[in-house]
Regions:
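Mature N-terminal, pre-catalytic/accessory segment of carbohydrate-active enzymes
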Residues: 68-98, 102-123, 128-129
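Conserved catalytic cores of very large enzyme subunits
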Residues: 1-75, 108-112, 124-533
Length: 533
């Protein structure tokens, strides 16, 4: 049957191999790997402006000049544009059928839909109605190409995308907002959305520091506030020259009970960070947010952002326990002897060395498995998406694991348990300084989840904790973050580009904490890890 067939495709076999590489490491969430679908920000602007005919002409020009190794892929992109046009034709025919049976305002509405669908997306949009209609069809086709999981496809700076079309007719803020409500409804199909974590951003500054807020920014905020829908996530770029009016327009979101709250991003911080990580100055203003909080360059960046997930809390647990899970009793890591220690006192005295050494070894295995997962998803090419990710110029698929089809490429690692580890290191230091004779007692208390030693639990809970203006532990957290980030960045993805650290936990601090035993910061077995850090 179909399920059996899908279980033995080349994609399924390659993905199975990736998880085989991970072995038992993923059984209790030491780390996790996945084949990344979605999590990109296509640049829809050229297709909105020129239509599929303009994009097809560019493809044909580049196809004629390229080598034989890329001609087939250029052809695939052209066929994918045909699919978008077929979809538009179907809707146009449906609108025409509805028009024939309607009267009054309904007839006028269907007539407008029919005429619009016969124009876009083949040709460029000339007003906001046409631009939104074209965008919806483009987005629908892109999501269908990655069915069933187009997670975290994100719009980018929607106010900059749509403002030129609003301005062409000087459409009022109120009318523009009413059209954007239809756009937001599109993202929420029936009782769910196309996919979770799709993001839309407004605001921000240019590469020269000029504020780029425009009338469409406010129209989009009005639409979001009135609709209060869960998808797409609303994000806002801020900077030192953000106008007072934008802050005032945002206030209603934060002070209305039950209303969605936008995520805020600081251009003045992110611009230098992105530039330091290799983003060209000319591309900085086009950074947007994919998914929850991942900054990527619109139309140029395959960040592969959720390719791997690392659980520092679990690694610390195994370092202290001699490699035996205190959750299940399963042997998952190195013994004390393999870590170079004769007893538990030596383990605690050398906990930082042991921890970072084990992080490096687990990260090495994690990235090998993650790269294998990327190779699996690379078998499922995405020619339509690639027309908006640099493929028109390169003739290379966005997911290609042998040749880089986007200007920027990397792989992500979401890191969990930073504060748990930092607090634990300080607690261990405190115990060794004040009562070193209790080293074995601490390890036993962790093994039994403090059930027989509530006094030890109370002692650990009273040690200094991150985030309480305690310089010692805050410095420790900084050191843990820097060292772990350096370890992760030393690993290379399928194209030889670095893995990037992301100290964030969309909600997985709950799941990953469930697989971590008691830790020296006083956290009990299966309790969640720190949110974000």
């Amino acid at each position: 049957d179909l399920k059996e067939y899908n279980n033995h495709t080349k994609f399924a076999d390659t993905l199975r191999h990736a998880y085989d590489l991970a072995g038992d490491d993923t059984s209790e969430a030491i780390y996790f790997i996945e084949q990344v679908t979605g999590h990109l920000i296509p640049d829809v602007r050229p297709m909105l402006a020129g239509g599929t005919e303009s994009i097809r002409a560019q493809i044909e020009k580049n196809q004629a000049a390229c080598g034989d190794d890329r001609k087939d892929y250029f052809e695939a992109m052209k066929i994918s544009l045909d699919a978008l046009e077929v979809l538009a034709d179907r809707y146009a025919a449906l609108a025409e059928e509805k028009e024939a049976a309607a009267s009054g305002e309904a007839k006028e509405r269907y007539h407008l839909m029919k005429d619009t669908l016969k124009k876009v997306p083949r040709h460029g949009a000339d007003d906001l109605f046409e631009a939104i209609q074209s965008f919806i069809l483009i987005w629908q086709t892109m999501c269908l190409e990655q069915t069933p999981n187009p997670f975290a496809f994100s719009v980018g700076n929607a106010d900059r995308i749509f403002e030129p079309y609003r301005a062409k007719t000087n459409m009022s803020r109120e009318v523009a907002a009413s059209l954007f409500k239809h756009l937001l409804v599109f993202f929420n199909v029936a009782d769910r959305s196309w996919a979770i974590s799709q993001n839309l951003i407004i605001g921000g500054k240019s590469n020269e520091g000029e504020d780029l807020t425009n009338p469409t920014s406010y129209a989009l905020l009005d639409a979001y506030y009135d609709m209060n829908l869960p998808q797409p996530i609303l994000s806002v770029k801020l900077h030192k020259n953000t106008p007072k009016e934008l802050y005032e327009s945002l206030g209603r979101f934060f002070f209305t009970p039950g209303c969605l709250t936008p995520s805020l991003f600081n251009d003045d911080s992110l611009f230098p960070i992105l530039e330091a990580h290799g983003v060209d100055h000319e591309d900085l203003q086009d950074y947007s947010v994919a998914g929850c909080q991942e900054p990527l360059i619109m139309g140029k960046d395959n960040g592969n952002t959720t390719n791997s997930w690392l659980n520092l809390g679990k690694i610390l647990e195994l370092c202290i326990s001699g490699g035996v899970s205190t959750i299940t009793g399963k042997k998952l890591g190195k013994t004390d002897e393999e870590n170079g220690c004769k007893n538990k006192l030596e383990v605690l005295q050398n906990i930082r060395r042991i921890f970072y050494q084990n992080v490096d070894e687990y990260a090495d295995r994690m990235t090998k498995a993650a790269n294998a997962a990327s190779e699996a998803i690379g078998l499922l090419q995405v020619p339509f998406l690639s027309t908006m990710m640099g493929g028109v110029e390169s003739g290379i698929d966005t997911r290609d694991t042998k040749r880089q089809g986007t200007k920027y490429n990397g792989s992500g690692c979401l890191i969990h348990g930073l504060s748990v580890v930092a607090d634990s290191f300080i607690a261990i230091d405190t115990l060794l300084k004040e009562r070193p004779q209790d080293a074995d007692r601490l390890v036993e208390a962790l093994r039994t989840n403090f059930e027989n030693d509530p006094q030890m639990h109370e002692y650990l809970m009273n040690c200094k904790k991150f985030g309480n203006n305690e310089a010692e532990v805050d410095r420790e957290a900084q050191e843990v973050a820097n060292k772990v980030a350096d370890i992760v960045a030393s690993k290379k993805n399928y194209l030889g580009n670095p893995f990037w650290s992301d100290f964030s936990t969309p909600s997985t601090h709950l799941l990953y904490g469930y697989w971590v035993g008691a830790t020296p910061d006083g956290r009990k077995s299966r309790d969640m890890l720190g949110y974000g850090v």
